[in-house]
Structures are given as C-alpha cells and as structure tokens.
C-alpha cells in the first residue's frame, strides 16, 4: 500500500502498528493481513535472548525487549495491521506483554510522519523459574537474520548480533529439520553469511 493511502486509511480508526525487533522484522513470518511495513527505530528499549520455559515442550530462548535508557536504540520494522487482528497477534506473541509506545519513541528511517494510531511493542515476561539451560533454535535465528538482511543489508545482520544481549546462549542446529513453525528458506549466500556471523556460538 502506498504511504499516502495508508495515512488516509488510518483515519478510519481501525489500524494499529507494532514494532518488530526479532522474527517480525521478516515479513515472511507474518501471518495476518498486514497492510504495510516500514523500517523504523525504537528508542528506550534493549533486546536480549530470554529463556522461555512457557513455550512448547523444549527449553528454547527467544528474543525479548525491555524498557531501558532513552539512549538505547533498536532497529526494526514497524508493521501496520488491522486492529481486529490484535487477538491473533497476541496469540502469536504468547508470553509477551503488549506495551504501548508513543510517536516520540519511534522514528521512521525516511522521516515520514506517523499516522495517529495505537503503537505497540511486545516485551517478554520474565520466567518465574528456569530449571534447565535454554538454547536458540537456528531455524528461528535464521528467520530473524534474514529479516535484518533484507531490510538493512549485511551491516544490519552484524549490528543485530552486536546489539543483542546474551548471545552466549547456545545454538541448537535445526536448520535441516526446522522446529520453528515460521521457518524460512535460505539461499546459499544467506546460509554462508549467517554461519559466519554466528561462528562464535557454541552448539548443544
């Protein structure tokens, strides 16, 4: 959808936007009728890997964000969607709190003015108890890094790794048999790049 048409559509009061900083940066993982997305930067949040014992039957770590210093900046994707899809989005982001953010917290990369609609970001709830070491599914990480590659180039992938805390979490190499439900297909060059930038990680 063209930007002018989106702004006009927003006046109807049935649109929302949410900031993606992990798998949502990759449009191939979107499962609702998304209208539009824009590269954006969120101020005042940090990203890290977080144990998620509440998800599925295996001890996975997923990306989370949390409010932090106003000096902290996250690159990501601002996704414009219908407000009626919020229940589906909340279901996808099970175990995350949907936080409201303001236009002052968000900056589009081409300096477009944001329409007056509700703006959100999802922040993972801290687990009450962690009984075992958790790991990162490579199929999940691939989806995230492909999103950053397509939106921000190779530098964006490297910045994602450098600016995400707890990347010492171990990797579970499931690329050949993906366990992440919204896994993506990679080109040979993407596989090479992603393996290169994560070569420091230990595997389980």
Named regions from a protein language model:
Residues 1-204:
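A glycine-rich, hydrophobic/aromatic-adjacent loop/helix-cap motif
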């Amino acid at each position: 959808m063209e930007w002018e048409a989106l702004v006009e559509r927003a006046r109807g009061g049935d649109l929302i936007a949410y900031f993606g900083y992990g798998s949502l940066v990759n449009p191939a993982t979107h499962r609702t009728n998304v209208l539009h997305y824009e590269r954006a930067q969120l101020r005042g949040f940090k990203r890290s890997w977080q144990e998620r014992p509440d998800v599925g039957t295996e001890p996975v770590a997923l990306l989370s964000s949390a409010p932090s210093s106003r000096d902290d900046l996250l690159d990501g994707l601002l996704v414009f969607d219908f407000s009626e899809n919020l229940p589906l989005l909340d279901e996808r982001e099970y175990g995350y709190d949907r936080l409201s953010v303001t236009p002052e917290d968000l900056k589009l990369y081409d300096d477009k003015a944001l329409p007056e609609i509700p703006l959100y970001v999802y922040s993972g709830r801290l687990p009450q108890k962690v009984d075992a070491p958790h790991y990162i599914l490579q199929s999940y990480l691939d989806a995230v890094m492909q999103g950053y590659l397509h939106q921000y180039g190779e530098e964006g992938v490297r910045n994602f790794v450098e600016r995400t805390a707890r990347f010492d979490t171990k990797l579970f190499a499931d690329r050949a048999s993906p366990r992440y439900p919204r896994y993506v297909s990679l080109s040979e060059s993407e596989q090479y790049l992603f393996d290169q930038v994560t070569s420091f990680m230990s595997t389980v």
